[in-house]
């Protein structure tokens, strides 16, 4: 009969991807995600191993023989899961190693400033404690992912070309100045008791320079919001568990929450500066190699 094919080759059945593969695809899992996730768990293991007495104090609060779920630190677990999921999303080692480097250096500077000026102190009385420093680059990676998600979402829903551009619309320009002027207004009275400290003056001047020289209004606002959002839960956990305490004894102070947004913007701007400097160094090195005399002549 016409149109009927005999002995047609059988096509193999295509199995749908497993739920794990679909989840990895949604998260944007890459080869670099394996490296970052392994490094993340390695840092957690090292901290728990070296500072095991601190981990024992946390575990001791839980009554494992009774209603342990009432004493379990669900907030910490939630923060841990959010950070884990975000740092593996669309991971790129070339970009992320710079974020880790800037976050580590910046976190060390911020913790040294805060603990040495007694704006806050840790229950271990270290100034600053080394075990808290790795939290900064991990948070920086998480904030970078959240910011890119915000930026992607705005690009999807925006129908105006100027809103999808690098600088953003007039809305982001106004939002930028309102947000950072309010932040600076909260910063001054909070750090006023330490105006006699050189660290505070340097921190204040750095904030003034960063605020007064915006490079991308939209991305600055989104980074600030992402840092503030994550910073709220970090500060809520740390201050209510008395892991660290501010001199105002607030749990947490509004300025401390917003300061995470400012730190995120500062780290992002520092990363841009490092890229520019590194690019110029590489170009100059290549230029010198290109103009070097041939030893065989």
Q: What residues fall within each predicted segment?
A:
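Aromatic-rich, lipid-facing transmembrane alpha helices and their immediate juxtamembrane interface loops
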Residues: 2-297
């Amino acid at each position: 009969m016409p149109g009927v094919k005999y002995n047609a080759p059988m096509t193999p059945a295509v199995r749908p991807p497993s739920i794990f593969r679909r989840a990895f695809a949604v998260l944007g899992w890459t080869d670099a995600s394996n490296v970052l996730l392994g490094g993340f768990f390695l840092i957690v293991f090292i901290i728990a191993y070296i500072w095991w007495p601190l981990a024992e104090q946390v575990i001791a609060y839980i009554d494992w023989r009774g209603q342990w779920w009432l004493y379990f630190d669900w907030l910490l677990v939630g923060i841990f899961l959010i950070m884990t999921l975000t740092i593996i999303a669309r991971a790129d080692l070339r970009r992320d190693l710079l974020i880790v480097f800037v976050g580590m250096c910046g976190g060390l500077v911020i913790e040294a400033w805060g603990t040495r000026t007694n704006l806050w102190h840790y229950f271990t009385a270290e100034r600053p404690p080394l075990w808290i420093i790795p939290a900064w680059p991990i948070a920086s990676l998480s904030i970078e992912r959240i910011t890119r998600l915000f930026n992607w979402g705005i690009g999807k829903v925006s129908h105006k070309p100027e809103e999808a551009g690098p600088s953003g619309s007039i809305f982001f320009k106004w939002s930028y100045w309102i947000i950072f002027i309010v932040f600076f207004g909260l910063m001054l009275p909070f750090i006023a008791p330490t105006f006699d400290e050189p660290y505070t003056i340097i921190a204040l001047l750095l904030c003034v320079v960063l605020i007064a020289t915006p490079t991308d209004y939209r991305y600055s606002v989104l980074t600030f919001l992402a840092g503030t959002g994550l910073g709220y839960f970090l500060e809520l956990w740390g201050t209510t568990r008395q892991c660290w305490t501010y001199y105002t004894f607030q749990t947490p102070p509004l300025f401390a929450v917003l300061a995470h947004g400012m730190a995120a913007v500062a780290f992002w701007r520092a990363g841009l500066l490092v890229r520019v400097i590194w690019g110029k160094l590489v170009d100059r090195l290549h230029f010198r190699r290109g103009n070097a005399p041939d030893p065989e002549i």
